[in-house]
Amino acid sequence: LKLAVLGFTSFPEFHGQFLKGARDAGAELEDFNTQVDYFSYDDGATNTPESDAFLEQTLRRIQDGGYDGLLALARSTPTFRELGESGVYVATAVNDVEPDMRRFHICYNGFVAGRIAAELIYCWMPDRPRPVAIASGWKDMRIHSATVSGFEAQTKQTPLNIGSVYYNYDNPDVAYESTRRLLEACPQLGAIYVNTFNSSGVIRAVRETGRELVLVTSDLNNELRSCIQSGFVAASIFQNQYEQGRRGLHSLFQALANDEPVQDVVMITPEIILSSNLALF
């Protein structure tokens, strides 16, 4: 078998773990006559003409290169459908495309992650009538919209006043500036849930303004580790991108080598990172 893994590394600590999981799975498959090639865009933001060109060129290269299957950190493009129609088994990870463009998708359960975030804020915010905000990535990105939907659904059971859902397009500078504007416009803000890896700008804005509020973030990096340890960030919700890469490639192999069925969406269970269990992550 000849397999390909396609990734982007705009947030190296996040995307690198996905690629590491896929590489570890690829090493485990070496004894099964399986070749795995890895393609990654390492030149910055993923919402640029350059990254779009890389995606299209790489998908064409895979289509013309005799590959049997692809596991991709996906962004919507009709080329995924063309790839599948040409006989390549397409699977996506982290972010999905239209279901008819791929065979299965692996991700963490964003809806449940959003519900967890809302419940944590409800438990920890002493003045619950205060408004809360969600710092999201992209309005039309499925994993981001799923977390927002989960948060909104949970507030029907643990009532919170959602004052704002604002978007930063996975750009740390936009996250910082938009959070500064939010804090200035809403002096009573009680909490922010950051539903993407892009938390550094939000954290910087809150630090600079000296505001006391509940911060719940997503995933883990060196900055978040120290923020959780100090209590500045109350908790982070882990989507285990390493396991998405590892399990995603193994599932792709099993589907092709053994004709094993894979459910349409493979869900990874979100985990809560607190100061008390931080050493486990």
Name every feature range the model reports, one short phrase each.
Residues 1-53:
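Amphipathic helical "hinge" segments at domain boundaries
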Residues 13-31, 113-117, 142-161, 178, ...:
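Short, solvent-exposed amphipathic alpha-helices that sit
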Residues 55-57, 65-85, 151, 167-225:
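Hydrophobic alpha-helical
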Residues 75-112, 221-234:
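Flexible loop/hinge segments that line or gate small-molecule binding clefts
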Residues 105-131, 175-176, 224, 239-257:
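Hydrophobic alpha-helical segments within soluble ligand-binding/sensing domains
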Residues 139, 153-155, 240-281:
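Hinge/cleft segment of the Venus flytrap/periplasmic-binding protein
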